[in-house]
Amino acid sequence: MPSEILNKARAYEAKHGAAISPAERPAYHMTPYVGWLNDPNGFSYYKGKYHQFYQYNPYDVRWAPMHWGHAVSTDLLHWEYLPCALAPDSPADNGPGCFSGSATEMDDGKQLLMYTSVIAEKQPNGEMRDIQTQSIAIGDGLDYEKPACNPVLTQKDLPEGFSKFDFRDPKIWRETDGTYSAVTVCLAEDGSGAAVLFQSKDGFDWHFVTVLERCNNQYGKMWECPDFFPLDGKQVLMLGPMEMLPKGEFHNGHNVIAFIGSYDEATHTFTKENVQLMDGGIDFYATQTTLAPDGRRIMTAWLQTWSDTEDKPKGCKWFGQTICPRELHIKDGRIVQTPVRELDAVHGKRIFHENVTVQSETSLEGIKDRVADLTVTVQPGEYRSFILKLAADADHHTSLTYDPYTSQLTLDRSYAGSRADIVHTRSCKVRSQNGALKLRILLDKNSIEVFANDGEQTMTAWIYTPQSAQDITFAATGSDVNLTVEQYELNL
């Protein structure tokens, strides 16, 4: 029986979410039914549909005590809203609420949600602090019940010295023998993050197994949103470090990184061999993956970052969205990302320009839109820079600039329309190919996702530009550049 708090949230979203027209939302990126969205949660395939829950405040476009919103899809592009799944309505979570978590299927066909339950607790010095534990809820894909045994993991289940104030974000899965496994993150005794593995035979009674990886103050401070999965013969530990320093390909603040290595299941030993940044853009955090029925490893993420959440469109009825889900593979020891192939099925009218030579700023016939799948292939050459402007008009644009001499690709949304003092420019290094470059760009009203060289690097950003800014232009400095441009309209 849903609680009064949950019923209130469901009634509110049913009234106010239904009042938001499809035209007010992106075409193929998931947004909250109404109000606020941050981390995607419970990304899973269950009863023939993809389920994507999310951190949710239905009542306002800002963070507040967390609920779990809920949506389902058959193609990862069109999302149907279901009633709010979880609310802060139990003794384990009736403070800041139901934080991030995940989902898996149980032996009896029910769906098990595992989430971070948070309450405020008075400390000996009189200070109120949030205490983080892990709880579960069991349901049928629509309604979920929290058992009386919650929380199922607390500080007493952690190694000595690990913090009860920073212990969160369980990612749950089933082993081949049916065992339930979950990786969480916690603040270790050295003041930096650790990824901790727990297991259970039934999903209710959990025990500590091992510390999979420690930050040792090398990759930021506290970690968030862990995931642990096999991929193309390797094992991946993916997570979101906080308070990173700009070393190598990493940038200040929140990042998403992946440790790639091997895993000994008998000893539960993870050995990292490589580490990489998962997105070099501005708005990308809180990743989570699931295994599709056909064996693809598919990733979702929050198309936002915490530092710019106060920069909202005036009068917006919703805030926050998730990326277009991405397929993951390993190539030459690194993860590559491509948009899910379901996007190809909605390709409409094709506009194609082959071997076009440009230098001064140039528009190409038919190449313009704010909802499109665009591929630009730059041939090797002696140009000094290539500049692509998107969502452009006389006053606005977001640019991608490639310097073949440094192999730097720069995303700049300074002229996208925001007046806020936030990060507007990021650069990442792409593989040097004597000036050759391939960019696949997903445009969806107020977002841009860039896949460089078949997904070897990605850059993601939210943009604040009026929808009337539709133009796309091409230019080069130093000498001419030769391009092939392909754009698909999307039949959504």
Task: Locate predicted features.
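Beta-rich carbohydrate-recognition and catalytic domains
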Residues: M1-D169, R174-Q218, P230-D279, L303-H353, ...
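Beta-rich accessory regions
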Residues: R10-K15, I257-L492
